[in-house]
């Protein structure tokens, strides 16, 4: 009997243990079902989150593509602007070289004009000397005319003084011959002076024509210098505009680079979050 009671107790105990295990199994089953439901909900949520992340990734990829295209366009514009600036620098250099050559030609023309003015001054001084000589010759001729008048007066007085005629006549004739020789000599010198005066006059006319020619050239050089100065100002204005354009492009490039860097950081954060989500799903 004791053995049966003992066995009955053991069976009862086993039954109670079995009931406890059944209840525990039921509880574990319910907990597993709840955990499964929770995991399914989390999976659906993660799938939705993954879908949203993929959509956002597509959006950021498109934005990144647009940013890259804008960056390439900005780089192309910057390259074109640099080429324009280089071209302007070459044009400015050519204009400066042409201006230097024009200044050299102007300096040469001014030097020649100064030499021509000096030659004209020397010719003018020569003219004054010639005029002074001619005036002296005229004074001599006037004196000779006076002497000739005196000789004629003496000849008229010879009729009244016959005794003195022979002696004075010889003297008068001799004086008259000398006076005529001096008069002929003066006439020859006057002819030479007139010829020299014509030569000097022609030289002065030639110098005046040459001076006028240099004046015209000087006006032409001044006009060329003015045109070159205007071109230089225009080139400087265009160069300043190109520099401002390059500055704006550089700022745009910097802004795009900052935006691209921010997008990269955002993309990196999203990628890390997506990796964590995938790892969580894998571990589940």
Curated annotation (Swiss-Prot):
Biological process per Gene Ontology, one example term:
actin filament organization
Quick check: keyword Signal in the entry? no
Q: Which key words tag this protein in UniProt?
A: Acetylation, Actin-binding, Coiled coil, Cytoplasm, Cytoskeleton, Muscle protein, Phosphoprotein
Q: How is it modified after translation?
A: Phosphorylated at Ser-283 by DAPK1 in response to oxidative stress and this phosphorylation enhances stress fiber formation in endothelial cells.
Briefly, what is this protein's role? Binds to actin filaments in muscle and non-muscle cells. Plays a central role, in association with the troponin complex, in the calcium dependent regulation of vertebrate striated muscle contraction. Smooth muscle contraction is regulated by interaction with caldesmon. In non-muscle cells is implicated in stabilizing cytoskeleton actin filaments.
| Record note on quaternary structure | Homodimer. Heterodimer of an alpha (TPM1, TPM3 or TPM4) and a beta (TPM2) chain. Interacts with HRG (via the HRR domain); the interaction contributes to the antiangiogenic properties of the histidine/proline-rich region (HRR) of HRG. Interacts (via N-terminus) with LMOD2 (via N-terminus) and TMOD1 (via N-terminus).
Name of the protein this chain belongs to: Tropomyosin alpha-1 chain
Q: Which organism is it from?
A: Bos taurus
């Amino acid at each position: 009997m004791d053995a049966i009671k003992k066995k009955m107790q053991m069976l009862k105990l086993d039954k109670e243990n079995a009931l406890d295990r059944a209840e525990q199994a039921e509880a574990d089953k319910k907990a597993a079902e709840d955990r499964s439901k929770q995991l399914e909900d989390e999976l659906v949520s993660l799938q939705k989150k993954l879908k949203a992340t993929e959509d956002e990734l597509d959006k950021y990829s498109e934005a990144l593509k647009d940013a890259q295209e804008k960056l390439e366009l900005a780089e192309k514009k910057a390259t074109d602007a640099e080429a324009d600036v280089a071209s302007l620098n070459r044009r400015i250099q050519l204009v400066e070289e042409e201006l230097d050559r024009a200044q050299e030609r102007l300096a040469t023309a001014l030097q020649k004009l100064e030499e021509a003015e000096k030659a004209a001054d020397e010719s003018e001084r020569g003219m004054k000397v010639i005029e002074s000589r001619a005036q002296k010759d005229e004074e001599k001729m006037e004196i000779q005319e006076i002497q000739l008048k005196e000789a004629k007066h003496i000849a008229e007085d010879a009729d009244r003084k016959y005794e003195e005629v022979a002696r004075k006549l010889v003297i008068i004739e001799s004086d008259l011959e000398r006076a005529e020789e001096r008069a002929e000599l003066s006439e020859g010198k006057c002819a030479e002076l007139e010829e020299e005066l014509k030569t000097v006059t022609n030289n002065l006319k030639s110098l005046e024509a040459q001076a006028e020619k240099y004046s015209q050239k000087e006006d032409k050089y001044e006009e060329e210098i003015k045109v070159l100065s205007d071109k230089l100002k225009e080139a400087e204005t265009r160069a300043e505009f190109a520099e401002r354009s390059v500055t704006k492009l550089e700022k745009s490039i910097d802004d795009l680079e900052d935006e691209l860097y921010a997008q990269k950081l955002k993309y990196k954060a999203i990628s890390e979050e997506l990796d964590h989500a995938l790892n969580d799903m894998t571990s589940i």
